[in-house]
Design a protein with these regions (language model features):
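Acyltransferase
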Residues: 193-238
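Short, contiguous clusters of charged residues that form electrostatic/catalytic patches at enzyme active sites
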Residues: 37, 41-48, 98-101, 149-153, ...
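Stable alpha-helical structural segments in soluble proteins, enriched in small hydrophobic residues
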Residues: 46-50, 85, 103, 201-214
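N-terminal beta-alpha supersecondary unit
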Residues: 1-64
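DPxDG-like acidic metal-binding loop motif
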Residues: 61-90, 95
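Surface "functional belts" at beta-alpha junctions
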Residues: 22, 31-34, 89-199, 225, ...
Length: 238
């Protein structure tokens, strides 16, 4: 199966072509321009590099959130439009799962001994995050929007952490700095590593997409925000 994989859910954006889980090519954008300016040019570049047209694809995979509300809207709308025009199906990928899969093999301990916490900065001491086993990516704390202090407490109470089965915690993504402050304030004495520079990579989106995710009709592709946007909160509050 050949997929165009895409991410616009955080500060950077990316696109890539993968076939049966193997990378053909990909492009990343770290520019200060908005995703509305950079995303579709990236798609055109990777399609040209791979020598494929939309009719040559079997589908599209895109991160649907949580993350940047504006970025998610851009990515989901663009992928939905491409898929509808080409008559192809889509795969919805969790942003935090894609982030975790982008950081596979980054742990200091052997597989099955680390708790990985992909965290995306949601501002105001909040993160979009989950906590999962590094080997199976089974979520021990589900993906949601969390207050950083509350999340650190939840993590400290996970039985696998308490009893040492997961003897290292790896916090990755733009929310790692927020989580570091929260853990340091709490003083739990846990063995924690932080990778604030870690980002969602096309290989992470592809790994999630090829991990048995369902192909859905493009019309059913929806964003997963996990929170109400600031604009919507202000509107609601008058």
């Amino acid at each position: 199966m050949r997929l165009l994989v895409c991410d616009t859910s955080d500060k950077n954006c990316s696109a890539g072509i993968f076939e049966d889980g193997k990378e053909i090519c990909y492009e990343l954008s770290f520019e200060s321009k908005t995703h509305s300016e950079t995303f579709m040019p990236l798609v055109h570049i990777v399609m040209a590099k791979a020598g494929v047209k939309h009719e040559d694809l079997d589908g599209y995979a895109v991160t649907v959130g949580p993350g940047s509300f504006t970025g998610i809207r851009i990515g989901v709308a663009a992928v939905k439009g491409m898929a509808l025009a080409a008559g192809k199906k889509c795969i919805a990928v969790s942003s935090t799962e894609a982030l975790a899969r982008s950081c596979e093999n980054a742990t200091m301990t052997p597989k099955n001994e680390t708790l990985i916490v992909p965290a995306i900065d949601a501002r105001n001491n909040r993160v979009f995050a989950q906590a999962a086993e590094d080997d199976t990516l089974k979520a021990l704390i589900p993906e949601d929007a969390y207050d950083a202090d509350a999340l650190t407490e939840k993590i400290s109470k996970i039985p696998e952490v308490i009893y040492g089965k997961r003897r290292q915690i790896l916090v990755v993504g733009s929310g790692a700095t927020v989580m570091k402050k929260a853990f340091e304030k709490a003083g739990y004495g846990l063995n924690i590593y932080y990778a604030p520079g870690a980002a969602i990579m096309p290989k992470g989106v592809a790994a999630a997409a090829f991990a048995g995710k369902e192909l859905i009709d493009a019309r059913d592709l929806k964003a997963s925000y996990c929170a109400v946007s600031q604009a919507e909160r202000l509107k609601k509050n008058g």
